[in-house]
Amino acid sequence: MAEAASCARKGTKYAEGTQPFTVLIEGNIGSGKTTYLNHFEKYKNDICLLTEPVEKWRNVNGVNLLELMYKDPKKWAMPFQSYVTLTMLQSHTAPTNKKLKIMERSIFSARYCFVENMRRNGSLEQGMYNTLEEWYKFIEESIHVQADLIIYLRTSPEVAYERIRQRARSEESCVPLKYLQELHELHEDWLIHQRRPQSCKVLVLDADLNLENIGTEYQRSESSIFDAISSNQQPSPVLVSPSKRQRVAR
């Protein structure tokens, strides 16, 4: 982080000007982020695709931090979120010669959704939360995190819960519906109600749809991304699937 601090003193940010047009894929656990990312595999020669670094969280020199966090959040929430911050920052600043980078989640959702939820439910003591906030402030001031468009895979907690049950990841076996409901509200506050700072536009997709019917939503977002790149402009502020418009209006 010394290089980042040096850049900050010079009035520039570390990694500034090094990243292409960057799209962040956001949504609850079980919202279909990895499936969405797989949709762009056909463009892998032109796009830098970065999945959420879950495998790193599962193996920190032989330690499964993700599993430990779910089993004993009071003890492991702080080290887990510290490592999440590091690994997400590595993805944000990873060099690429591609014209487009698409990332599964970001340092923003870690801060505004997961860390905030841990503070609210008591998994993070106030001192722990304050420490993480200081890290986020340092990153915000010193390191450039490219974000041109957020794709929000908007999913009801009940649908997300059923998908989690079906995929049966061992670490997620203890995830209750209430936890997904809490995360859903935090995503809504951030991406729909805009109660958190936003540096880019948001495209909202109806991710409750099953695989047979969600292709239209994928195609809509794909067109929006490539149109924005070709015109060097960002899409309209909040583009919402027709089936979701009434919910956003409330």
From Swiss-Prot:
Its EC number is 2.7.1.145. GO terms for cellular component: cytoplasm; mitochondrion. Keywords: ATP-binding, DNA synthesis, Kinase, Nucleotide-binding, Phosphoprotein, Transferase. Signal peptide: none annotated. The keyword DNA-binding does not apply. ATP binds at residues 27-35. Substrate binds at residues 52, 70, 81, 105, 172. It catalyses: a 2'-deoxyribonucleoside + ATP = a 2'-deoxyribonucleoside 5'-phosphate + ADP + H(+). Subject to feedback inhibition by dTTP. Gene3D superfamilies: P-loop containing nucleotide triphosphate hydrolases. Pfam families: dNK (PF01712). The modification Phosphoserine is found at residues 236, 241, 243. The active site is at residue 104. Changing residue 45 to D: Reduces enzyme activity towards dA, dG, dT and dC about 5-fold. It is an enzyme of class 2 (transferase). GO terms for biological process: DNA biosynthetic process; nucleoside phosphate biosynthetic process; nucleoside salvage. GO terms for molecular function: ATP binding; cytidine kinase activity; deoxyadenosine kinase activity; deoxycytidine kinase activity; deoxyguanosine kinase activity; deoxynucleoside kinase activity; kinase activity; thymidine kinase activity. Monomer. Deoxyribonucleoside kinase that has a broad specificity phosphorylating thymidine, 2'-deoxyriboadenosine, 2'-deoxyribocytidine and 2'-deoxyriboguanosine. Specificity is higher for pyrimidine nucleosides. Several anti-viral and anti-cancer nucleoside analogs are also efficiently phosphorylated. Belongs to the DCK/DGK family. This is Deoxynucleoside kinase. It comes from Drosophila melanogaster.
